[in-house]
Amino acid sequence: MLASWDLFKGILIVRFVSLENIKKQNSHIYYRSVYFAKVVYEYRDSNESKQVKFTIESTPLGEKHVTVEFLDSLNYPVLSLMIAIKKRVIDLDIKGGLP
């Protein structure tokens, strides 16, 4: 009988490490902020990095929507990485850590 972890042995997991070199793009739209950064993540037991663009858009009701776009191509599923990036961006925004 296979143990539960044996079922996931072949799945490659991408783990978020950090966002670095965050730079804000100048914009004349007050409710939309666009940033560029380097995301560092762990994949196959080594650190890799890619360029990303993320946007924080404030709605009229005060909600904030975050979108993430990878500027470099990726050849593997990155849903968990995108979710982690969005969580980090929201955390930085709340704490005032974005430029």
Task: Report the location of each language-model feature.
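Short beta-strand segments that buttress and anchor functional surface loops
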Residues: A37-E42
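Short connector loops at helix/strand junctions that flank enzyme active sites
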Residues: R32-F36, N47-Q51
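Acidic, low-complexity intrinsically disordered segments
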Residues: L2-W5, R15, K23, S49-P99
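Short, solvent-exposed beta-strand/turn "edge" segments of beta-rich domains on protein surfaces
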Residues: K23-R32, Y43-D45
